[in-house]
Curated annotation (Swiss-Prot):
Alphabetized UniProt keyword annotations: ATP-binding, Hydrolase, Nucleotide-binding
The UniProt record lists the keyword Nucleotide-binding: yes
Name listed for the protein in its UniProt record: 5-oxoprolinase subunit A
Database matches in Gene3D superfamilies: Glycoside hydrolase/deacetylase
The organism's place on the tree of life at top rank: Bacteria
Record NCBIfam families: PRK05406.1-3, PRK05406.1-4, PRK05406.1-5
Chain's role: Catalyzes the cleavage of 5-oxoproline to form L-glutamate coupled to the hydrolysis of ATP to ADP and inorganic phosphate.
């Protein structure tokens, strides 16, 4: 049994290089919610050195809100914005001897794409026109998974061990109670359940089936790096290999 571990990098948390020793896929901010050319180049260089799969982490152009404010934009504008960010990271990756293997939208763009077909299709179209061999990381069971597969792209279904889930499989919004899980032992147990049993318990108590292909490790917070290391160690102790998503076999 295998799983991919991913983390969002280039966002100024300060632990990017160390996180790259723990994950198999890196989602690199493309400058619209955080990061910039220097951070992008640094993260790409480290990822290439450590053999970590490189992914783009595009967002709405909203640095003031860290890309977490929902926006109602025309599909063409979303398409162009995603394509623009992919182009920027791709140029840096090529110069450093790497390439973009996947795309994971950030923040509000990610959440809206999970439920809004217009936004999902705009993202998928941009990825397809950029390079149809690039995979899309999307919330498990979401509309973005469907849109990507309908367009002939590889969709990698993502789960979050430290986020609360609703009974419909969506994430509890960050501003609501139960959105974030703080008990490390609970999160570790939840991680193993997601991978082994392919399900997660919602806040309501119901069990939600999901296809866990990649797990997001959060790198922000004073104890995030140590906890990410605990998760990696727990998976390996349970006999679960950690490999980039394009090599995952569940």
């Amino acid at each position: 049994m295998e799983i991919d571990l991913n983390a969002d990098l280039g966002e100024g948390c300060g632990s990017d290089e160390a996180l790259l020793d723990l994950v198999s896929s890196a989602n690199i901010a493309c400058g619209w919610h955080a990061g910039g050319p220097n951070a992008m180049r640094e993260c790409v260089r480290w990822a290439v050195e450590k053999g970590v799969s490189i992914g783009a982490h595009p967002s709405f152009n909203d640095p003031e809100n860290f890309g977490r404010k929902e926006m109602d934009l025309p599909a063409g504008e979303i398409y162009a914005g995603v394509l623009y960010q992919l182009g920027a990271l791709s140029a840096i990756a090529q110069a450093e001897g790497g390439r973009i293997a996947h795309v994971k939208p950030h923040g509000a763009l990610y959440n809206q794409a999970a439920r809004d077909p217009k936004i999902a299709d705009a993202i998928v179209s941009a990825v397809h026109d950029f390079d149809p061999s690039v995979a899309v990381f999307a919330l498990a069971n979401s509309g973005l998974v469907t849109a990507a597969r309908n367009a002939g792209l590889v969709a990698i279904e993502e789960v979050f061990a430290d986020r609360g889930y609703r009974a419909d499989g969506s994430l509890v919004p960050r501003k609501e109670p139960g959105a974030m899980l703080d008990d490390e032992d609970e999160v570790l147990a939840r991680t193993l359940t997601m991978v082994r049993e392919q399900r997660v318990q919602a806040l309501s108590g119901e069990w939600v089936p999901l296809n866990a292909q990649t797990i997001c490790l959060h790198g922000d917070g004073p104890h995030a790096l140590a906890f990410a290391r605990r998760i990696r160690n727990a998976l390996e102790a349970a006999g679960i290999g950690v490999h980039a998503a394009n090599a995952v076999r569940v």
